[in-house]
Amino acid sequence: MPEEYIMSSKACIYVLGGAANTAALFDFDGVYILDGGFAEKNPGFVAHVRDVSAVLLAAPTLGNLGTTSALLEQGKPLPVFTNTKPFKTAKPGSSGEIAKAIQEANSKILSVAPPLFNPKYPANIIYQSAAKGVLSLYILAGDVKDAEVITKALAGGNEAEVEKAAAEHGTIGVLLWRPAMTDQSVVRVLISGTSSLSRIQQSLDKAAKSLPFLNVPTVKSKDALSDIPAPAVPRPVAGKPSARPATTTGTATRPTRPAVPAASAPRALTSRAPAGPSRPTTTRNAAPAPRTAVPSRATVLTKTAPASKAPTRAPVPARSAPAPPRGAPAKPAANTAKAEPIAQKKTVGKVQGTAPSKPAPAAPASAATSPAPAPEAPRRDPNNVTIVLDDSLSPEDFNQGSAPMDIVVIPPTPEPPRHEVAQATHPEESIIDAEDLAKAPLEVDDVANLADVEDEIPPPVDAFKKPEPHPEPNVSGGSEEDKIPEPVDAFKKPDPVELDDFDPLKPSHPEPSAPVVPSDHIIIATPDPELPDIVAAVPFVSPSPKGPNDGLVKLDDELEKIAPGFEEPLIPQAPRDDGTLAECSEEVSKLVEISMDTDNSAEVAADLAKAVGEVTQLSADLQNLGLDEKTDEYVRKLSNQMIEDATLPFTSALASSIVTSNGSETNGHGEQAHAAQNGGIDHQKEIPKHDLMQSRSSVIENGAAVQYEKTDPALDDVLNACAQESEKIDASHPDNLHMPAAPGSAAPAKPVKFARPYYFDVVTVPRNEKLETSVAADGLQEFISKVRSRNVILASKDISGEQLQAILCGKQTWCDSAHPCNVIPTHSSPMLLDFRQKNEEQFAANNLQFSIPVEKQRTTVSSDAGAIEYELARVDLL
């Protein structure tokens, strides 16, 4: 490769490959920045560049410090940015010794301090030129505490601890290159070293608001540091002469316009400040005050003044009648209150009473006001109506200078007619007939003269009041039809009578079928027990055998044949101890059989003891595991709890019921059930088919293989198919015992989720010192989908197919499909080659590209020392 190829005038990146590590050399128009390095103390490809402006060591591990140490030995000043504290001692031959030497060389350079995190995210200027541009470094993570942890690990000399400290406390930064030309795009590089994915996510989410150039896909050089434009505030327009605010000076500078009479009499606004009578008031509308000026209360509120002297021009919402002249008398108050009468009632029924007549003339309230006469209502015929007044109306209610109103009286609810007997005890009370009512004097129809009426007004009748009961008079000589029978209580028990002891089913005389039997007669029992016995008409004669004619009974000199066995009275046979008869083939009762089933308590106790032994053995095995102190304590408590639960009455009863359900010796299958529990099968006797899922496996397996019954081939096929499917599902999962977290231990890490997408030009996938991607497929998909970069450096050593597929799935989530993405793998593998061949169409559809791995790209550099070949990949950034 010719030397002029190295001196490029275009921003690019050289991805340097090696057997143990990778590094990145950035070329920003001749400004070189080295990110990382190699373990060998050899500058390598960096020796062919002109000058290195700075070295960034985000993870100061042993695999990164060799190149930096070789560059410092050349004697040129080289700023090295790493987050470490001053070393006191370092172990010889360790990474701490090299870091201490780098720190001593760096201390001789002016104004080179270790970059530390600042919540304000200031820009650390690395290079600045008016002809080329500005190179800045923003620190997102890495403070004093992180520096102490890394320094302690380096001083200890344990490289494993150094790598762990670099992953958890390493420096994370953003490198920003702003070209001198304002219309060119900036270059954004994520510097993460070997930091974990969670640390990267937390750092970016915190810096999202302070670094606005990370929130858009493309940023110009002039807009890189500009904030989001705030909403424009409208400026106040220059006021016109008619829109100037009212003056508040003491002397009037211009004459006051004549007052315009108000169209109506609106309610005057009051002001807390006293208004001066000599201060003039302008009639022009005030212009709205600017936003910055705060108007005072005195200028906003209208000042009180007499309506005849200084009326103000106010907008009237609706046109109304003009105001009356000054000499005209004011309208009466009754007319102004016409729209609001004192009371109004609506007629809801027939009116009982005369129509209200015109009111009496009332005294005027004042000389200036006089009530207008109300229209007189038409007179009605007084013969058909009556007036019934309520107590709530008084004569004073009609002398209140208000408008006349209609009096509506609601008639009471008529009571139902009663059929009462004429009372003879009160002859002085007379009944008013309809004719007397018609001859009654006419009622006064003038409501105003009600006070002069001397007639007594009957009190109003409450229609909702329940009438009081009146005692019914006792009228002698009435007919039987007028008598009302007293109500009869249907639930009252009647009084006892003489016939209460009468029982219709109890005979009062002896039954004819049960006569008195003489002592010398025979009673013959009938076959039916419900029928009465039959009494023979002959007396009983005890049988007596006579010589050879045994079995013959002579009754009244006649011989009768007696059946065998009935020569003597029948004596019942006594039962045995078990409740059965001696000469009877009676089966043993079921109750006795159940009592015999409970005799196997010894076997149940043995099975229970065996189960407890199994639990004890399991707890002992768990205690023998090599666990830490907290987990061992947790397992010990769990095993003790299992042993206690196994001895509970509920557990023993459950085990007994399971054993009994599989069969017992009383049913003839005890031997088969016992053989099935011990793992053996008796082929001579067929095991009955119980519930298929109840007795498929043994109750206690004793650590041996489970023995299944071979009586249902169809069910065996189903179980085998399920087992095969479960093996396929669990093939990718290791057979590890997942114990719950011990009390006090750290909870499992939650999946990493970025708050929003971020845009870069170069990023490196989180990796470890072995050049392997340190995140799983889910984390890699989240990283690619949210950290959207044009160029992605992928540590592809021993990468899996799931991780490669996660990169493709993450790229598919980008909203801007035209935004390209170039993946630069560091190592080649058959998995990577096969993935590239199978997904060529998907790459083209999603604008994704996989370049040739770095280890497959060779570049030769010719110099005076000769030609040297390097593993590197060059990628343009602009």
Swiss-Prot record:
GO terms for biological process: axonogenesis; dendrite development; microtubule cytoskeleton organization; regulation of microtubule depolymerization. Residues 416-425, 480-496 have a biased composition (Basic and acidic residues). GO terms for molecular function: actin binding; microtubule binding. It is found in: Cell projection, Dendrite; Perikaryon; Cell projection, Axon; Cytoplasm, Cytoskeleton. Residues 224-425, 456-518 are annotated as: Disordered. Its main location: other. InterPro entries: MAP1. Interacts with dlg-1. This is Microtubule-associated protein homolog maph-1.1. It comes from Caenorhabditis elegans. The gene is maph-1.1.
